[in-house]
Amino acid sequence: MPVVDISAAEIGIYSLSGDTKNPTPNIEFNLNSFRDPLGNLHLRRTCVDGKDPAVQEWIKVDPRFEPILNQCIILAKDATQGGTKWFSIGFRDHHGTWISRAVATLISNELATLGFKVGVLHAKGQD
């Protein structure tokens, strides 16, 4: 199933910056400990934000990514099998432009591949 418009989703995925107040997700992951793509000169020069596939591939190597993905799959299954009509997961990092957008995009694509009706909202980053 492809990622859908956020208004048609049963699971909302949000990328958030340090100062984003809304939306407020049901569950939020703090990604500040992830390695920062801005530290990679090639990515910084060739990519615009975390929605770029090169940034996403770089983020997937971080040892924190796979456990978060697995936890999100469990949360999505629990929410939808429990009859919840709406459930949201947020990913926050300082800038909200690189790490959180990459993780939100990767997680939403994986959940959609598993058949969940997922929508993504990328909040305005600080960059």
Predicted region positions:
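Catalytic phosphate/metal-binding cores of nucleic-acid and nucleotide-processing enzymes, i.e., regions
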Residues: 3-5, 86, 114
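Post-Walker A helix-loop "phosphate-sensing" segment adjacent to the P-loop in P-loop NTPases
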Residues: 108-118
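Catalytic cysteine-centered active loop of the rhodanese-like fold, especially the PTP/DSP P-loop
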Residues: 82-110
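Short beta-strand-centered segment that lines the nucleotide-binding/catalytic pocket of NTP-utilizing
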Residues: 116-127
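Helix-loop module immediately N-terminal to the HCX5R catalytic loop
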Residues: 39-87
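Short coil/turn segments at beta-strand junctions that form active-site/ligand-binding loops
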Residues: 26, 83-87, 116
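Glycine-rich, flexible N-terminal cofactor/catalytic loop recognition
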Residues: 2-50
